[in-house]
Amino acid sequence: MSVIRADEVLESLNKQIEEFQVSANLEEVGTVIQVGDGVARIYGLEKAMMGEMLEFESGIVGVVFNLEEDNVGAVLLGSDVAVREGSIVKRTGKILSVPVGKGLLGRVVDGLGNPIDGKGPLTDIAYYSPVEKIAPGVVKRKSVHEPLQTGIKAIDAMIPIGRGQRELIIGDRATGKTTIAIDTILNQKGQGVYCIYVAIGQKRANVVHIVETLQKHGAMEYTTVVAATSSDPATMQYIAPFVGCTIGEYFRDNGMHALVIYDDLTKHAYAYRQLSLLLRRPPGREAYPGDVFYLHSRLLERAAKLNDELGAGSLTALPIIETQAGDVAAYIPTNVISITDGQIFLEADLFYKGIRPAINAGISVSRVGGAAQIKAMKQVAGTLRLDLAQYRELEAFVQFASELDKATQAQIARGQRMVELLKQPPNQPVPVEKQVAIIYVAGQGYLDDVSVNAIQKFEKEFYVFLDTEKPDILEAIRREKALTDDIKAKLDAAVKEFKQKVAF
């Protein structure tokens, strides 16, 4: 029988006392006093921060949206079914963050950056980045000077977009707004621009169709789709654009170029209005809260061209706004027009006439993109906007005038051919060197003897002719980025040779 010695017991007790550590986990908790419609009011979280993540006992995460005298208003990032009055809520001390990095390319994620495409978890994540960030200051920026080619002749010629610009696409529903955005993504293939498409409040079938289009043209390799569809909670629709912007900022801040498309900010404003009214914020014009301008300005100001010291990266934004019966003077359209660096206005009347893309060149403008346009395009498209405006004026005048002089007839004929030339089918972006070539050909009068109905056939076959027999001309335009006398002479000779070979 072993004897327990007192000194051994004492030594063992002393050792355990030395190794004993007191650990206290201090958490600030509150209680749900009201819940419903995706929002909750919580009592007891006196030190909660605006935008802080909260954890409910059911596992649901919420975000602090309102700080009031005796309670906190939170929006829920998920279903509120499992949240009950009296449920315990605890602070996390963290701001809402999402994964960023090249691992998101080719993926479809929800409004919180979680994959929803069935391809498994995200890989190659650089880090988690806060969703709400302050936009780069004036000192960190550089003026827009590099072109972002959309592949759409009417835009690249008359309303050029530069890297780091915010260009609004505005128009009624079903006028081709999303088509312009998707064509722009397709045209970035091989251009070193990473794209983020944010679908806000759209039908799931539409999102699937867009993803299929991008996959078909090999564009998903450099694109991330952030989808907060109409069946998702208003909170997800509200957060999705900020998540898309954060994903794009990773590329911008690491010396790369990114393009983010918000489709559309009208539904984003609806979601924000819904959350604000549910949390009893005072309504203003059209029942929107007073800070709805700041909602969009703080989002769009994050698009920027950074200076060389910070890596010269850029984030370009193409927000989309849907108007009602062409009313650009409504609250949200005027807000976003004043925030952005220009707008592309799509008109339903032009769309129904078969002029697609249905861009109204008269009221569409790019405030900073002119500095980014390549010299060759400036040379050929300098007077294009003015010529089209004069043509529209004459077209209206012709309806009342019986006899016209030859100069006016010639101007109308040239205008008709230009309008026909600027038409473009969807998902067929045109490289800038081909755009320069065809606009030069039209400007020099080589299309004046081609019937209006044959213009698009002429254009298509002329591109094939240049690709197969005169690739050196396209290469020279690509290389020089300007129309030298030598290139002009070669183009003149090429179009004459083409017209002799092919009859129109």
Swiss-Prot record:
The molecular function GO annotations come to: ADP binding; ATP binding; proton-transporting ATP synthase activity, rotational mechanism
Location in or out of the cell: Cell inner membrane
Q: Does the keyword Glycosyltransferase apply?
A: no
> Which domain of life, per UniProt?
Bacteria
Q: Give the way it sits in the membrane.
A: Peripheral membrane protein
Recorded hits in Gene3D superfamilies, A to Z, give: 2.40.30.20, ATP synthase alpha/beta chain, C-terminal domain, P-loop containing nucleotide triphosphate hydrolases
Q: Which InterPro entries match?
A: ATP_synth_asu-like_sf, ATP_synth_asu_C, ATP_synth_asu_C_sf, ATP_synth_F1_a_nt-bd_dom, ATP_synth_F1_asu, ATPase_a/bsu_AS, ATPase_F1/V1/A1_a/bsu_N, ATPase_F1/V1/A1_a/bsu_N_sf
| Positions of the record's site feature: Required for activity | S364
Q: Name one GO cellular component term.
A: plasma membrane
Residues holding ATP: G171, D172, R173, A174, T175, G176, K177, T178
Pfam families hit by this protein: ATP-synt_ab, ATP-synt_ab_C, ATP-synt_ab_N
The protein's job, in short, is: Produces ATP from ADP in the presence of a proton gradient across the membrane. The alpha chain is a regulatory subunit.
Q: Which PANTHER family match?
A: ATP SYNTHASE SUBUNIT ALPHA, MITOCHONDRIAL
The family note in this entry says:
Belongs to the ATPase alpha/beta chains family.
Q: How does it assemble?
A: F-type ATPases have 2 components, CF(1) - the catalytic core - and CF(0) - the membrane proton channel. CF(1) has five subunits: alpha(3), beta(3), gamma(1), delta(1), epsilon(1). CF(0) has three main subunits: a(1), b(2) and c(9-12). The alpha and beta chains form an alternating ring which encloses part of the gamma chain. CF(1) is attached to CF(0) by a central stalk formed by the gamma and epsilon chains, while a peripheral stalk is formed by the delta and b chains.
The name of this protein is ATP synthase subunit alpha
Source species, please?
Sulfurihydrogenibium sp. (strain YO3AOP1)
Q: Which gene encodes it?
A: atpA
